[in-house]
Amino acid sequence: MKDQFVIAYLADFSMTQEVVSHACHMARMLNKGLILLYIEDSRYHLPSVDEAEKTLLRLEKEHPDVNPAHVALKGNTREIINALPTLLNGVVAVAGIDTHARIGSLCNPKRVLHNFAQCKIAYLTVQQPLADPTPYSNVAFSIDFHKESKEKLIWASYFARFNHSRLRMLHFQYNDPGLHNKWHNNVLFMDKFFSGLKVTYDTLTVEGRALFPETIVCRTAADAGCSLLVSVTTDTRNRDVIEWFVGAQEDRIVRNPRQLPILFINPRNDIYVLCD
């Protein structure tokens, strides 16, 4: 019996295949259980818990290899998502993104980011079903001059260790000596962390400049054949004026036209170590 779970968040069942296919692979990769989660929230026009149970039971039978369980709850979507680590022993969630969904839809990109904004576990946003026979074979992440997220490196290492993924570290060229020094220190920190786990990576230089650098990182990762990007969301405590008015980087890469799955990690003060 598994005691930690990948959470397949089936918002309104409109992206069931997309979410479940990725969640099943994550459960196998991490050797965790799988929970199919449905939330009946009175603020949205959704099937009742009783109606949802029928679909959830059918989905359980369709995936005997991972032996999923299901949970159907009533309540506030965001509050339940925030409680996933303690409520369901969740370690990572998978959510579907529909770039054509109306703003009030639970699968609308902005709505997904809003509902997961305070989530303490990583969450994978997906736009299409997992069809690759070797899923996540190339996983990208970027290193810049900002304070490095150890949890991002931990998650990147999971893909290398448990999925045998090839890691691609993307970075910009910094002409400013101060920024270059900060970036170099982050690389040294990463190298020390990865060396202890015997994890290797390739480097890829990102060309160009943009108001939101992660959008170029996302495009470069897709062009390089990467099948997943690990990204840290903007700390709301540190947002500048531009970000408050035009949005943060995650608002753009979540709906990337190449449909690259994005594993988002919200900034947090503590580190949640999932696997040894």
Please annotate each region the language model reported.
Residues M1-S48, N138-K182, K192-T203, N256-P257:
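Small/aliphatic-rich secondary-structure junction motif
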Residues V20-H22, I80-L84, R111, W155, ...:
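A short acidic, amphipathic alpha-helical/loop segment
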Residues I35-L37, A69-L73, L124, R168-L170, ...:
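General small-molecule cofactor/ligand-binding pocket signal
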Residues P47, S105-L106, K152, G178-K182, ...:
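Short, well-ordered secondary-structure micro-motifs
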Residues K61-A69, L197-L204:
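A short helix-to-beta-strand connector/capping loop
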Residues A72-I80, R209-I216:
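Charged docking surfaces used in two-component/phosphorelay signaling
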Residues I80-D132, A221-D276:
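Gly/Ser-rich helix-loop-strand patches that form or flank binding pockets
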Residues N181-N238:
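Glycine/small-residue-rich hydrophobic helix-like segments
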